[in-house]
């Protein structure tokens, strides 16, 4: 997850999903890693394009991008879109 302190939708994600994320099946399959938009881009993500929209959720497998969700559409739609990304990962 690419985030920044001044992002109201990052806070909304935290309020609506953040606490339960790691306890869900999807959260276990795609652990949430937080990267600050203004911070240094992690070395192991150098091959992944940075995003300027926060929050952005990038699903990475073996150093390759599977897909990304740009923005936070709300709790229910977030889970649906994340599941589509996980299904895409499974089909590769």
What residue ranges belong to the model's regions?
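Thiol-based oxidoreductase modules, predominantly thioredoxin-like and allied folds used
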Residues: 2, 25-42
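Short pre-active-site segment immediately N-terminal to redox-active cysteine/selenocysteine motifs
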Residues: 3-9, 53
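Typically the conserved alpha-helix immediately C-terminal to a functionally engaged Cys/Sec
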Residues: 10-26
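Extracellular/periplasmic catalytic domains that process cell-envelope and extracellular macromolecules
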Residues: 26-27, 49-53
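Short amphipathic alpha-helix with an adjacent loop that forms part of the alpha/beta core around
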Residues: 42-49
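A short, hydrophobic beta-strand/beta-hairpin element that forms part of a small beta-sheet core
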Residues: 53-69
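Thiol-/selenol-based redox modules, centered on thioredoxin-like
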Residues: 73-92
């Amino acid at each position: 997850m690419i985030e920044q302190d001044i992002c109201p939708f990052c806070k909304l994600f935290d309020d609506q999903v953040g606490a339960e994320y790691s306890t869900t099946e999807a959260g276990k399959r795609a652990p949430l890693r937080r990267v600050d938009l203004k911070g240094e881009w992690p070395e192991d993500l150098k091959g992944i394009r940075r995003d300027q929209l926060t929050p952005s959720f990038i699903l990475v497998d073996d150093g390759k991008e599977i897909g990304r969700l740009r923005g936070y559409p709300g709790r229910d739609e977030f889970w649906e879109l994340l599941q589509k990304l996980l299904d895409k990962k499974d089909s590769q």
